[in-house]
Amino acid sequence: MNDIWWQTYGEGNCHLVLLHGWGLNAEVWHCIREELGSHFTLHLVDLPGYGRSSGFGAMTLEEMTAQVAKNAPDQAIWLGWSLGGLVASQMALTHPERVQALVTVASSPCFSAREGWPGIKPEILGGFQQQLSDDFQRTVERFLALQTLGTETARQDARTLKSVVLAQPMPDVEVLNGGLEILKTVDLREALKNVNMPFLRLYGYLDGLVPRKIVPLLDTLWPHSTSQIMAKAAHAPFISHPAAFCQALMTLKSSL
């Protein structure tokens, strides 16, 4: 089995694992790497099948998490953005002793809309899966454009995301399909009631993929967690609002 691409950066006394979202790779953290690197030792990861971690097929959430855990430090803050938030959450469930704190960014324990639960309509996720086989490149670009809609810097932020995708090898259709399948089917709402490490949830007020309506629902479901909504951010707050994003992580670190 191949190894995944993993880079360590920075010299802070606290380890921080950064997990990207669907279709992307670790270059997405480029805009905050310098700032965070002076406070943390960063672990930049390309998830299995993405970017430089080629040679992997589609995986379940559990398989993906197990693969990432092999390379991970004994103790770290785990931060996951979007799909990466599910991987970080699964790590907190399976290896709680190794997760100093859990941070999810523009992520949902259940991305798919269910009865009484806001989310992405399953037929939209299914449509993306269908379109992937028809026009792979265009489907990924559409998904990226959705992530920045509504922000003051939407066009520029979408260009940033596109350049991240193009900077590394594109994932196979099978891998992208597997990622959409995770987004469509996984539901960790009940399971995450049981995590007891510090748990920070960051959201963008304008996010079109993870509706802000889930925030009060999860505040009630997970009273041990803390939530913060960034007023003018959409699905990629670390790109549109890097200073506020980094500040939230420094505040978390100082509380540990």
UniProtKB/Swiss-Prot annotation:
This is Pimeloyl-[acyl-carrier protein] methyl ester esterase. Its EC number is 3.1.1.85. Coiled coil: none annotated. The gene is bioH. Residues 15-242 form the AB hydrolase-1 domain. NCBIfam families: bioH, PRK10349.1. HAMAP family: Carboxylester. Pathway: Cofactor biosynthesis; biotin biosynthesis. InterPro entries: AB_hydrolase_1, AB_hydrolase_fold, BioH, Carboxylesterase_BioH. GO terms for biological process: biotin biosynthetic process. The physiological role of BioH is to remove the methyl group introduced by BioC when the pimeloyl moiety is complete. It allows to synthesize pimeloyl-ACP via the fatty acid synthetic pathway through the hydrolysis of the ester bonds of pimeloyl-ACP esters. The active site is at residues 82, 207, 235. It comes from Salmonella typhimurium (strain LT2 / SGSC1412 / ATCC 700720). One of its GO terms (molecular function) is pimelyl-[acyl-carrier protein] methyl ester esterase activity. It is an enzyme of class 3 (hydrolase). Pfam families: Abhydrolase_1. Keywords: Biotin biosynthesis, Cytoplasm, Hydrolase, Serine esterase. Belongs to the AB hydrolase superfamily. Carboxylesterase BioH family. Monomer. It catalyses: 6-carboxyhexanoyl-[ACP] methyl ester + H2O = 6-carboxyhexanoyl-[ACP] + methanol + H(+). One of its GO terms (cellular component) is cytoplasm.
